[in-house]
């Protein structure tokens, strides 16, 4: 364990941030999974609704710095392409 007061504080902050980041990443995975499920079921309306939710979650995560903005853009692009491919 850290000996300096500032190091102890930094450790507490890093633990808090790690927990927050983990929660956001879980939310991202669940949103993406929901879109993929709707795409495999070929339910276009539900897929588009879930895509909107996923885009929101990804944009928020990238603006908070949890994931890189290009990573978010890539995921959104691939999900959009999958939803547009539904006939």
Swiss-Prot record:
Family matches, as InterPro entries: Ribosomal_bS20, Ribosomal_bS20_sf
GO MF: small ribosomal subunit rRNA binding; structural constituent of ribosome
Function of the protein: Binds directly to 16S ribosomal RNA.
GO CC term (a single one): cytosol
GO BP: translation
Cleavable signal peptide: none
HAMAP family: Ribosomal_bS20
One Pfam assignment: Ribosomal_S20p
Keywords, alphabetical: Ribonucleoprotein, Ribosomal protein, RNA-binding, rRNA-binding
Record-given protein name: Small ribosomal subunit protein bS20
Disordered as annotated region, ranges: 1-23
Classification of source organism: Bacteria, Pseudomonadati, Thermodesulfobacteriota, Desulfovibrionia, Desulfovibrionales
Keyword Disulfide bond: no
Entry similarity comment: Belongs to the bacterial ribosomal protein bS20 family.
